[in-house]
């Protein structure tokens, strides 16, 4: 699921 992957990507990048 690309949305889940994008969410994780944003999360690790933002935090």
Curated annotation (Swiss-Prot):
Q: Any idea where this protein resides?
A: Secreted
The record's keywords, sorted A to Z, are:
Secreted
**Record keyword Secreted present:** yes
Secreted: is it a keyword of this entry?
yes
Superkingdom is Eukaryota
Q: Name one GO cellular component term.
A: extracellular region
Name recorded for this polypeptide: Unknown protein 1
